[in-house]
A protein has these predicted regions:
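Conserved donor NDP-sugar-binding/catalytic core segment of glycosyltransferases
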Residues: 97-130
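A conserved acidic beta->alpha catalytic loop
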Residues: 31, 39-48, 89
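Conserved nucleotide-sugar donor-binding catalytic segment
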Residues: 130, 135-214
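Short aromatic/hydrophobic "clamp" motif used to bind/position activated sugar donors
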Residues: 85
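Cell-envelope/extracellular polymer assembly enzymes that use nucleotide-activated donors
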Residues: 3-6, 34, 179
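N-proximal low-complexity "stem/linker" segments adjacent to membrane-targeting elements
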Residues: 1-27
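Glycine-rich, basic loop-to-helix element that forms the pyrophosphate-binding segment
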Residues: 63-80
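Catalytic core of nucleotide-sugar-dependent glycosyltransferases
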Residues: 189, 208-232
């Protein structure tokens, strides 16, 4: 099969990082790619950089004010026409030029979701290690919506649901990505582990900078999906796990 991948990049004032993200997409060896860039009316040179690449490559883009990250991501979903959707926001990158080719080789007529590993990188794009190696969140061999009971076990940048399964994002919740992934998984029947590192994730982001609020939002999302009492016990485990992880001198990203 030769599925079309809709890659969506959301950016606001991202002149320092957007070019590397764009290059990782337009330099893919796999040809069936729809690339969408959603800019939130940046005031720096972001739009100038986007225009430069849009003149050379088939990039569809908009630049307008939005109501935040997830509003912009919803705009991207509405614009997408491909088979599978991947959010690769400014600063994140596909890890190699043949990444989409490897993923496409895993697709069957019945595939609903594809997923894989994520490489963590610093601001100089030095690879730190995979998310499974360096954090408490280990990528499951078999991913199900129940796998999310203790948090985000798969990185957004390495998760490709079929477009027909994708709901709109919640607004005003920093853990809306968890809710979105759970809903996609709940709607899926055939979920494929690609057994490959898909993306490079630049450390930082909204949820990192507003950590306390993101934890509260995560609690509310998981309570909605798993119930009050199970969520209490799950979060006791989350706290216990984080404590022991820190005790062994590892950084929790």
């Amino acid at each position: 099969m030769q599925p079309i991948f809709s890659i969506i990049t959301v950016v606001f004032n991202g002149e320092a990082y957007i070019e590397g993200t764009i290059q990782s997409v337009v330099n893919q060896t796999y040809p069936h790619v729809e690339y969408l860039i959603i800019d939130g009316a940046s005031k720096d040179k972001t739009v100038e950089i986007v225009k430069k690449y849009a003149e050379k490559y088939p990039i569809r883009w908009i630049s307008e004010r939005d109501k935040g990250l997830y509003d912009a991501m919803n705009k991207g979903l509405k614009m997408a026409t491909g088979d599978f959707v991947l959010f690769l926001n400014a600063g994140d990158r596909l890890i190699s030029g043949d990444t989409l080719e490897k993923i496409a080789a895993c697709v069957t007529p019945h595939t609903d979701i594809l997923y894989g590993e994520t490489m963590l990188v610093d601001e100089k794009y030095h690879q730190i290690g995979t998310r499974s190696e360096l954090t408490v969140q280990k990528l499951p061999e078999k991913l199900m919506w129940q796998s999310m009971k203790n948090g985000m076990v798969v990185c957004h940048q390495s998760f490709l649901p079929h477009r027909k399964l994708t709901p709109q994002y919640l607004q005003g919740n920093l853990a809306a990505d968890i809710d979105w992934v759970i809903k996609c998984l709940q709607s899926a029947e055939n979920i494929t582990n690609t057994h490959t590192v898909i993306s490079e994730y630049l450390m930082g982001g909204v949820s990192k900078k507003q950590h306390q609020q993101s934890l509260k939002d995560r609690y509310a999302i998981l309570k909605k999906h798993f119930g009050f009492l199970p969520n209490i016990f799950n979060h006791l485990y989350i706290v216990w796990r984080a404590f022991w992880f820190k005790l062994w001198n590892k950084k929790t990203y």
